[in-house]
A protein has these predicted regions:
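Exported/periplasmic ABC-transporter solute-binding proteins
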Residues: 1-174
Length: 174
């Protein structure tokens, strides 16, 4: 009977939670705490996280309200805390990238698998029309202690926002 079938679960890969900004925005190093403050609405202006910034309001855009990316942020990054008022949703990850490309004050949140330039078979080149944010677990983010969601940094633990991807397999003959 089907009720006696027990699925097997296997980790098959990793995906990073990536933060992206407009290509004209050079503010690309943030701490985990900076990003949490942005996501919860405690930091709503660029000057709240980048002293002296004149960029204005921060708009945060996700792929959609019920996506795995959104759920991961609520559960694993914000630990159940509510999103701020500056959060909005597109319908797809491509729309997030397009929105960030067209809106200089925005931050997009997508899976890192959407970032790679498909023309680069080594997967070490990110899309040219956006900047990928580097994230630090330290109290102050610098280029030396902040990491982009490259596969190597997802695997070795330097990049802090990593999701494990699983395959669930059911063998009806077991």
């Amino acid at each position: 009977s089907k009720s006696n079938v027990i699925p097997s679960v296997f980790p098959i890969g990793y995906d990073g939670l990536a933060f992206i900004v407009n290509k004209n925005n050079n503010d690309t190093c943030f701490t985990v705490n900076d990003l949490k403050r942005i996501l919860t609405g405690k930091a709503t202006k660029w000057s709240d996280v980048v002293p002296g910034s004149k960029r204005g309001d921060i708009e945060v855009v996700f792929d959609n309200t019920r996506s795995a990316t959104t759920n991961f942020v609520v559960d694993s990054v914000l630990h159940g805390e509510k999103f701020g008022e500056n959060i909005m949703a597109a319908k797809t990850s491509k729309q997030v990238i397009d929105y960030v490309d067209q809106n200089p004050g925005s931050i997009g949140v997508i899976g890192s698998n959407w970032l790679n330039d498909r023309r680069d078979s080594t997967n070490t080149t990110f899309k040219k029309n956006i900047h990928v944010v580097s994230v630090s677990i330290k109290d102050k983010a610098t280029p030396m202690n902040s990491w982009k969601p490259y596969q190597a940094y997802l695997l070795d633990g330097r990049y802090p926002f990593v999701r494990t991807l699983y395959a669930i397999v059911v063998d009806p003959h077991k």
